[in-house]
A protein has these predicted regions:
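N-terminal secretory signal peptides and thylakoid transit peptides that target proteins
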Residues: 1-19
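Detector for C-terminal structural segments
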Residues: 17-29, 212, 217, 306-335, ...
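Alpha-helical secondary-structure segments
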Residues: 42, 122-129, 153-159, 201-202, ...
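N-terminal lobe/hinge region of extracytoplasmic solute-binding protein
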Residues: 44-100, 198-199
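Gly/Pro-rich hinge or "lid" segments in bacterial periplasmic/extracellular proteins
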Residues: 75-82, 164, 172-226, 230, ...
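Aromatic- and charge-enriched surface segment that lines or borders ligand/interaction sites
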Residues: 94-138, 157, 242-245, 293
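Ligand-site clamp/hinge motif
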Residues: 132, 218-264, 389
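Surface-exposed binding/hinge segments that line
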Residues: 140-185
Length: 520
């Protein structure tokens, strides 16, 4: 049994590289000679397909796994010979070079066609996509972007407002770098969800919600062929069922939860390997500070002291996660090693008494999967110990991701407590974009604002001194914690089990890059 740990060592330096063509990790898919004929890969995805619009999506699995199969990007995630995360030049470009800290030149591959008769992929599509991203829900990933200067239909230059070393990885390799068809998108009113008006990639897709996504060959694709002609991704929401499906030989790869990871380390399934994508996840319990029951900061701080994050790591994650003290993940500048509050039930009781609160009843909402429900159940017991009665309310992924967004209904007004986990990129600026003032009612479900926080966010993007960036991000997490609206929980590893006959390609954020997955 092999364990493939993907290192992030040297990431930031590598991400600022001036040219991508010289690195062996940057090949497009695989060569035609290596392409498998008629082979099918069977994988497991979980959760509902929410949206394939790169500027208006939840992100993560299965949205990104799908998006990377059917839309152009200038770069994807790759790894160098040491395992460090680097930009990987895609089949959609002949060349991409960072000429200087604020200019990235690229040349598109000619002859790549959009489906549904929308013509050739051109720099007009790239400009439209990037300009649109800069004003979308995901615009934080494009804060450094100023404009795209078109030279001709294939050549253009990305111009940044100021130097931002990880732009290729943070902004271009993730969903924010996905390119959509200008004419097709404008034709459907400027936005779409799960039915893309035009795609351009080696695969076509068909899907049935919560059942499957099937990827089949795109007959109009003139680029290099991926290793697997067909991919079937089946939806299995229950993690134990997914592990059983793998053990029964029904699927070739699946993400596994920490308890399964712990078990497979001791007793692996036959002919299997484990791949660890990274620990770029941060989980916390959020509190809606506008809710009448939680408006008093003493109540929120009491809840901070009531929750035992170490017990959650051991009970829900088998000790395989790292206890969290903020939103910056392990290995990154700005990672905290302690918080200003501690697990202290006596302090929690004293704060509740000081606030004159008794017989408090709250609801904890969580995604309906094993480790989140276990986490919420442990929190429920912690709160019970200080006199707070909590009810755990598991949610399917669709309703869960809608509940704090004002545009999706009125549920945000009812939110009290929730267990939340976001994925990050390999730079500390990324997680903070969701908590600035303008994200209230979108992704800042705790509903607080801070002028200092907003100013520091902008400062962190343009600051190049690592020591200064470290201080900025430490202070920003302190501001978040001081609202009383956050209980930091864990940073968990993203782990997959796969057949020894399959060489899985994983993004550092934990999704599968299926177009690069091939027979081992």
């Amino acid at each position: 049994m092999n364990i493939n740990q993907l290192s992030r060592r040297g990431f930031l330096a590598t991400a600022a590289m001036s040219g991508l063509g010289a690195t062996g990790a940057f090949g497009p898919f695989i060569s035609a000679a290596e392409a498998a004929d008629g082979k099918t890969l069977n994988v497991r995805l979980y959760g509902a397909l929410d949206s394939l619009d790169p500027g208006y999506m939840v992100g993560g699995t299965p949205d990104l796994d799908t998006l990377w199969c059917i839309t152009p990007s200038l770069v994807h995630y790759g790894h160098d010979s040491s395992g460090a995360v680097v930009p990987r030049k895609t089949a959609y470009v002949q060349e991409i070079v960072q000429r200087d800290p604020t200019h990235i030149d690229f040349t598109l591959t000619p002859g790549l066609m959009w489906t549904n008769g929308f013509g050739e992929l051109t720099t007009e599509d790239v400009k439209y996509s990037f300009d649109r991203m800069a004003v979308s829900e995901w615009k934080g990933g494009f804060d450094a972007y100023e404009r795209l200067d078109i030279i001709d239909k294939y050549k253009a230059t990305i111009v940044l407002k100021s130097p931002f070393a990880p732009f290729m990885i943070i902004s271009l390799a993730s969903n924010t770098g996905s390119i959509i068809c200008k004419k097709a998108t404008e034709g459907v009113g400027g936005k779409f969800t799960t039915d893309m008006p035009a795609t351009c990639g080696p695969y076509l897709y068909e899907w049935k919600q919560k059942q499957y996504i099937k990827f089949s060959p795109n007959p109009e694709w003139t680029g290099p062929k991926p290793a697997y002609e067909n991919i079937k991704a089946v939806f299995i929401s229950e993690d134990t069922a997914a592990a059983l499906a793998f053990e029964a030989g029904e699927i070739d790869a699946t993400k596994i939860v920490p308890t399964t990871y712990e078990r497979y380390l001791k007793t692996p399934p036959p002919n299997s390997s484990l791949a660890v994508a990274g620990a770029l996840q941060y989980m916390w319990m959020g509190m809606n500070q506008e809710h009448p029951k939680l408006k008093d900061i003493r109540v929120r701080k009491a809840i901070q002291h009531a929750v035992d994050a170490v017990s959650i790591n051991m009970g829900a994650y088998g000790g395989t996660a790292e206890t969290s003290y903020g939103v910056v993940c392990p290995g990154l500048i700005g990672k905290r090693n302690e918080s200003k509050y501690s697990y202290d039930p006596a302090k929690a009781k004293a704060l509740l008494a000081e606030a004159g609160v008794s017989d408090l009843e709250l609801t904890i909402r969580t995604l309906n999967n094993q480790e989140r429900v276990l986490t919420a159940t442990i929190i429920q017991a912690n709160l019970q110990a200080v006199g707070i009665k909590a009810t755990v309310l598991p949610q399917d992924s669709g309703p869960f991701w809608d509940m704090g967004q004002e545009s999706k209904g009125e549920v945000w007004k009812e939110l009290e407590l929730w267990v939340m986990r976001y994925g990050s990129q390999a730079d500390p600026f990324e997680p903070f974009q969701w908590f600035v003032s303008e994200q209230v009612g979108i992704w800042n479900w705790e509903r607080w604002t801070s002028d200092e926080f907003d100013a520091l966010y902008k400062e962190g993007i343009i600051e190049s001194d690592p020591a200064k960036r470290n201080e900025i991000y430490l202070r920003m997490q302190e501001i978040m914690e001081d609202t009383g609206s956050y209980v930091w929980l864990t940073h968990e590893a993203e782990v997959y089990v796969h057949r020894n006959t399959v060489d899985v390609d994983l993004a550092p954020t934990g999704e599968m890059q299926l177009i690069y997955t091939k027979p081992a």
